[in-house]
Amino acid sequence: MAELNDTYVVHTAMIRCSMGMRETYLVLDDTHGVFLRQQPQMTVDDSVGEVNVRCFGGCYSMENPSTKSEADRIQKAVEEECPDTFLDSVLNLFTGGEKEITTQEAQEGVPRIVGVCTPNIPAGTKWDNGKEGVETRGMEPLLGGAKLRCIYGGEIEIITSGQVEGTGE
């Protein structure tokens, strides 16, 4: 099979977001009239969040208001449920309440916080890998390996073309 970056992308190609919980599919809600192996071909303009780019199951980005809200909710619950221990109280007497936590201590045993994933792609943003010199209804056909950025900081990447392998018949 050809290298992904040189392969045309069709409806149901797999995509991944660097801030998402899982992979999902790239979808085409209305065909452009061009098909590859009976599957609608995608273009660089097929980059609309929640239309072409579907939910990745959850979002880890703290730039996402949903994730930030969940983090704030958890922090408040922890502060209410876990007042200072006796040791913390004694240490506070000697340190004035200042306790430095190392990065490793802060990361150990802390689960990642997840919010609602709503892919938010700025209007007019296009995928970054199209087939130049070829047009599908005036738009460049989309090629594999293309990337797109969500406003919440996630990098969305096409990881399969979506094309079904031929049987050779």
What residue ranges belong to the model's regions?
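Intrinsically disordered, low-complexity proline/glycine-rich segments
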Residues: 1-169
